[in-house]
Amino acid sequence: YAVIPKNFDAEKPSALVTGGVHGYETSGVQGALQFIETKLAQYAEQVNIVVVPCVSPWGYESINRWNPMALDPNRSFYSDSPAPESAQLMQLVSDLALSLTLHIDLHETTDTDNSEFRPALAARDGVTHDNWNIPDGFYTVANTPSPQIEFQKAVIEAVKKVTHIAPADENGKIIGADVVSEGVICYDKKSLYLCGGM
């Protein structure tokens, strides 16, 4: 389901908040729900905000990264996507004719990435899995073509007030990507078909 404004105002910017694209990343779902309960009304005067708190409800209920067809919804944001979760979210954004100024896609990295989900993916795809350091702390993933580093830094500074920021590993990386600013890495979200690249 989605929480959408009663009346879209074309004069205001539009933002999308998503959680639970990977269902087992439960803090994204809980964070989106908490945002709805505690902050949405505060920002609704300035911004058209759409919140989809749980993109992959089956994954959330079954504590799973993938959907029942063993597809990763967060690698499936492309035309004619076989992942219904991804296709439905893209259709919602299209139906609402959202021109997004901001998209916050809430994720977390858990120990089960190394112990369960990444090894299963490697086995399915017939490739080798190397463990990567699971970061301890908050970090952001900027979009490589337009990283908006000053915005990322502002997010990091705000988050520092409530929790610690993930340090780089011994190779200067977080989840295998170069750290471009404290707690900030970049992915080309569109080419990876990520939710944040819509």
Predicted regions and their residues:
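Metal-centered catalytic cores of metalloenzymes
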Residues: Y1, S79-A83, L192-M198
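Short beta-strand-to-loop junctions in surface cap/lid or active-site-entrance loops
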Residues: Y1-E11
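Acidic/polar N-terminal loop/beta-strand segments that form early-domain functional surfaces
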Residues: V3-P5, T18, C54
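Short glycine-rich or small-residue beta-strand-to-loop segments that form or flank ligand, phosphate
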Residues: A15-V21
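Active-site-adjacent mobile loop/cap segments within catalytic or ligand-binding domains
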Residues: D169-M198
